[in-house]
Amino acid sequence: QPRLIEGLENVKDSFNSYPLDAVAQAVGSAALSDSAYYEETAKKITATRDKTIERLREMGFSVTDSKTNFIFAGKKGVDAADLKKFLEKNKIFVRHWDAPRISGYLRISVGTDEQMEILLSKIREYVSR
């Protein structure tokens, strides 16, 4: 049975790409039990997301409408995979997929206002070179 358990441990994340450990579950449960905190945090994230979307669109990016804590954005003439590498060199981490329909886009998680300003600044730097 130890080999079976080891095998299951090795593949578990391939079925659930966003696993939550017990600590994350406890923190999430506590956050949801404080509805005032939850509402305030949701408002901040929404405002930051919407402001970032607006700024990306001003730079010519196509951005899908979002009701989540992430932004899906791309720009014609900008190599999304190369932009991802540029951002990583600047310690900004986004996601990119090679699938043909979405290879020109990045998935950007919404951070704090300050983090998103840094992201926008680096994207502006990249597209203006």
Sequence positions of predicted segments:
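PLP-dependent aminotransferase class I/II
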Residues: 1-56, 62-64
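A generic structural signal for secondary-structure junctions
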Residues: 9, 13, 33, 76, ...
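Alpha-helix N-cap/loop-to-helix initiation residues
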Residues: 34, 80, 112-116
